[in-house]
Regions:
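Short, low-to-moderate order helix/coil transition modules at the start of elongated helical scaffolds
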Residues: 2-271, 275-281
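Conserved beta-strand/loop scaffold segments within soluble protein domains that form the structured core
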Residues: 154, 160-449, 463-491
């Protein structure tokens, strides 16, 4: 059942409490240097394909990667599918400003993939140092991949992780190092090229991304992370992430994204395919900080087997337009899904996000908890889709969406959809839409906060359930992004 309210919302949750550990004190946000994300590196000497899409472009990408014929044929079928399919109609924000004839589908620095930051070209290394990736690798990660425009420029994994049998590399490298059959078995099976027009585009020109294989019973103590940086103006990024977590294994994978702002359109149309085996667990965390000229048309999907569990943690910031609906297919008995997410739509932004869960086996469970914020005329739309099949006896699903508008010119919508075909299932939906309580702001100002500080504190409290699900350094980044979005929120 849906409940909508326009009443003022008091959302001061998240303030420090006595005895709370330092790792959980995240309400305070440090100053943000905008140059951390908006700096631009020159493309001198880079290889850049001509704008637009053609069979020659697709074949050249495949040739550069020395792909097997089956992958080339898949690309060519995808191109035909893309040309045949129409643009989305009557769905989400308008994307008429995206003209593929002005987008380059492949840009590469020419740098060889390195296993040491010392071997990465200085200009590219400086980019990732400013984003904090090498430091995060040293302190809290089991492995890191870094993509710059269309190609991975750095990839490394700790020796002890590799010795456990974990494979963490690019899809391209995996195809040439004994995993071609595994990739062919899984690649493009969860997200077919016919899913939508931009899925077809992705399969035609995909480049880069990550391949992760975790053997049965292996549990990683630290996360793996891939970071995707789109530096080139008027370009697209089309990475493909393929993760296979075998029965009884455990993995936390983190995905980070950013790009500088240009006065021309950029496009991100990646794909994420995740396979969670019997009794396995996968947490997939994402902080997306695309620039506000970006069209973010990403597709993510997971298949979860018996007693398996997937946990999505998603923070969506930036981009001009976003279509993002991670989908979970619970196909084994007692498979479960948890989705925790937040979006922040500021001026000129229209973020259409949400998630879909299909419960297709007995005793499956799904929990969705999302937060959305909008200010400065930004539009935030949350779509949820819960499907319960006839076989899903005693399935349980709950969806909760809380929206907070920070002014009178912004907009927030909640669009739930439920398809329940089993009488023993229980499905619930709750939505709240509101504004910051004036009384809350006045109280915080009476305690010494400025109005700007008070509003930022309230918003951080609102976002705290998502922040708590992230590793400390990524929670700090998310809170910094919130403060960056909050600058100028008064007046």
């Amino acid at each position: 059942m849906e409940r909508e309210s326009n009443a003022a919302v008091d959302v001061t949750a998240g303030a420090d409490t006595p005895g709370e550990s330092p790792e959980r004190r995240r309400a305070e946000v440090g100053d943000v240097d905008r140059s951390m994300y908006d700096f631009v590196k020159p493309e001198s000497g880079y290889e850049r394909f001509a704008d637009g899409l053609s069979g020659d472009v697709v074949e050249e990408i495949s040739r550069k990667k020395d792909e097997p014929d089956w992958m080339l044929q898949m690309r060519l079928r995808a191109l035909e599918t893309y040309e045949r399919m129409e643009m989305p109609k009557n769905w989400g924000p308008a994307i008429g400003g995206l003209d593929m004839s002005t987008i380059s589908t492949y840009v590469a620095s020419g740098a060889k993939q390195a296993e040491s930051w010392d071997d990465v070209p200085d200009d590219i290394k400086d980019t990732f140092e400013r984003l904090g990736i090498p430091e995060a690798e040293r302190t809290s990660l089991a492995g890191v991949g870094a993509q710059y425009d269309s190609e991975i420029v750095y990839h490394n994994m700790k020796d002890e992780v590799a010795k456990s049998g974990v494979v963490y590399t690019t899809v391209e490298d995996a195809m040439h190092s004994g995993y071609e059959d595994m990739i062919r078995e899984h690649f493009g099976t969860l997200i077919p090229m016919t899913d939508h027009k931009f899925a077809a585009l992705h399969y035609a020109v995909w480049s880069g991304g990550s391949f992760v294989y975790v053997p049965a019973g292996v549990k990683l103590d630290f996360p793996l992370q891939s970071y995707f940086r789109l530096n080139a103006a008027g370009a697209g990024q089309f990475e493909h992430t393929l993760i296979i977590v075998e029965p009884g294994a455990d993995l936390h994978f983190i995905e980070g994204c950013s790009a500088p702002k240009y006065n021309v359109a950029n496009l991100h149309a990646g794909a994420v395919e995740l396979f969670v085996g019997k009794g396995a667990r996968l947490r997939y965390s994402t902080i997306e900080n695309w620039s506000k000229n970006m069209y973010n048309l990403n597709t993510k999907r997971v298949r979860v087997e018996e007693d398996g569990k997937v946990e999505w943690v998603s923070g969506s910031f930036g981009s001009h337009v976003s279509y993002l609906y991670p989908s979970s297919l619970l196909v084994g008995p007692r498979a479960s899904c948890e989705f925790t997410g937040i979006t922040f739509a500021g001026a000129t932004q229209n973020l259409d996000t949400g998630c879909k869960v299909t419960l297709a086996a007995p005793d499956t469970r799904a929990s969705v908890d999302t937060k959305s914020l909008s200010k400065g005329g930004g539009i935030s739309t949350f779509r949820s889709s819960v499907v319960v099949t006839k076989k899903a006896d005693r399935a349980r699903a709950s969806v909760s969406c809380s929206s907070l508008m920070l002014d009178d010119i912004s907009r927030s919508d909640t669009i739930p959809a439920m398809d329940v075909r089993n009488a023993t299932a229980s499905v619930g939906h709750e939505a709240t839409i509101g504004r910051i309580s004036d009384d809350t702001i006045l109280y915080l100002m009476s305690r010494g906060c400025s109005e700007q500080e008070a509003r930022t504190m309230v918003v951080n409290g609102f976002a705290d359930p998502v922040s708590k699900e992230l590793p400390l350094e990524y929670a700090v980044e998310m809170n910094n992004l919130i403060k960056l979005e909050m600058e100028g929120a008064i007046g």
